[in-house]
Regions:
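A structural boundary/capping signal
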Residues: 1-105
Length: 105
């Protein structure tokens, strides 16, 4: 399972440095095609979720996005970062994430 969700959504969040209402989220979702958990990243702004993974530009209501991905997956927390917090972690770790957990795949 390989995608670019951490990098794609990381790039978006750092483009929003002056807007703390955007949050970069790292968590675990369930892949619809095989029913198995995977590490994932997305953007939240209030009740809107945006996902720029794999060249897409998805926008859904948060409740629907979480429902489709079965988020939060039992035993896995959703971590949320402001643009500044995300940028600081990117610099400190020298990677896009995840930073606080080891996803199942």
């Amino acid at each position: 399972m390989a995608g670019d969700c951490y990098q794609a959504n990381g790039n978006f969040i750092i483009s929003q440095m002056n807007d703390k209402t955007f949050k970069l989220c790292h968590g675990v979702a369930i892949l619809a095609t095989d029913g198995r958990p995977f590490g994932h990243a997305w953007i939240e702004k209030g009740n809107l979720v945006m996902d720029f993974s794999n060249g897409k530009n998805k926008a859904l209501h948060k409740k629907k996005y979480y429902e489709l991905g079965k988020i939060p997956v039992k035993g896995h927390k959703v971590y949320k970062y402001t643009p500044k917090e995300a940028a600081m972690r990117m610099v400190k770790t020298k990677h896009w994430g995840p930073w606080e957990s080891k996803p199942p795949r």
